[in-house]
Regions:
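Hydrophobic membrane-embedded alpha-helices
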Residues: 2-40, 44-114, 121-332, 336
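Short, intrinsically disordered terminal tails adjacent to the first/last structured region
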Residues: 328-358
Length: 358
């Protein structure tokens, strides 16, 4: 989340690759959702898809709908000539096609709904993966076979994206398309399957070392990589996903991870709680508001404070109360691996693995 804010210059720091925060989130999301579904199937020999989708709706819909209403109101007041067009874009957002309208060139505008592109990919993943996983598990397909299939999908997506680059496809097509970004989600799914098997204790030190290498690799890319450079589109995005998966795997599999103190640091966890709303509202403030006459050169920081204030208000006054309804659609198994709870606050705006937000 913070990486995305920096990339959008709401936090005035210089990180060329801040946009990779979305990739980190995709991997983590695939890992957490798959882990939850696997635990439920192990405990009950079934997966309640109705409960899954009810919980997702209760988690995502309140802030999402309020944001879209605010976007329409601001558009009507600031740009009434664009209101009819904005209604159409909001309609695409409601059916989670924002990423495709940008990928296929239906409308490239960076309007208030543009930020929903990543949520659209996430929702498309929700629609396909849980039923498919339930079907595979019900048919007694071995974990190892599912893992191999996931690995092949990751490779296929990487090849597909590289082919598009070679053939001169537009960057928007490769960046926003579900078919070109799904590798990160499925790397997360693959990590969840791997995490079902406990590694020998003697491998923990190696795992920590590999996690450290992954952190170094990610920090380097986030600091230096170019959005328009060929590296990301010719395998780089997949390497980012694999490094993120390795980091998540190492933290999840080690009870004494060197990252644990950082990931359990309360300010990070608090930002994790409000990160979904913050991800939405920062974009609306960035595109449609200015505090320059009040804050001067501190305009970006003023927007950041305003975004955090709105996001926190949304979470505590609306989302948290509606989240209480989730108990009616509870999982019949423990929520998630304890160590995985540490991972979210740094990157994930949409999936909250805490007791309250799963």
């Amino acid at each position: 989340m913070i990486l995305v804010l920096i990339h959008h210059q709401l936090i005035p720091l210089s990180l060329n690759g801040g946009f990779l925060g979305v990739d980190l989130f995709f991997v983590l999301s695939g890992f957490l959702i798959t882990g939850l579904l696997l635990k439920e199937f192990k405990a009950t020999n079934s997966i309640s898809l109705m409960n899954f989708y009810a919980r997702r709706a209760l988690r995502l819909a309140p802030a999402f709908l309020i944001y879209l209403i605010a976007a329409l109101i601001l558009t009507y007041k600031q740009h009434p000539e664009e209101f009819a067009r904005e209604i159409k874009l909001v309609g695409l957002s409601l059916v989670y096609l924002t990423n495709w309208r940008m990928a296929l060139g239906w409308d490239y505008s960076l309007d208030p709904t543009a930020i929903i592109w990543s949520l659209s990919i996430e929702e498309q993943f929700y629609l396909v993966w849980p039923p498919l996983l339930f079907l595979l598990l019900s048919c007694r397909v071995k974990y190892s076979h599912i893992g191999v299939a996931l690995g092949l999908i990751v490779v296929a997506v990487a090849i597909h994206r590289a082919t598009l680059w070679t053939n001169g496809a537009e960057l928007n097509r490769m960046y926003y398309g579900t078919d070109t970004r799904a590798d990160a989600l499925f790397v997360g799914c693959l990590c969840a399957f791997v995490a079902q098997h406990r590694l020998p204790a003697k491998l923990e030190s190696t795992l920590r070392m590999l996690g450290l290498v992954a952190v170094g690799f990610l920090v380097y890319l986030i600091s230096t990589v170019s959005f328009t450079g060929q590296f990301l589109y010719r395998g780089g995005y997949t390497l980012v996903a694999l490094a993120t998966g390795l980091l998540i795997w190492s933290v999840n599999d080690s009870e004494h991870s060197w990252l644990a103190p950082l990931l359990t640091f309360y300010p990070f966890r608090w930002f994790g709680l409000i990160s979904y709303s913050l991800y939405l509202w920062h974009w609306l403030l960035l595109r449609n508001m200015s505090f320059y006459y009040v804050a001067g050169e501190w305009d970006s920081w003023a927007k950041f404070v305003a975004a955090v204030t709105i996001a926190a208000s949304s979470f505590y006054l609306i989302e948290k109360r509606i989240n209480n309804l989730k108990s009616r659609f509870s999982y019949s198994t423990p929520r998630i691996q304890p160590d995985a709870k540490k991972q979210l606050p740094l990157v994930g705006p949409f999936v909250q693995p805490s007791e309250q937000n799963t």
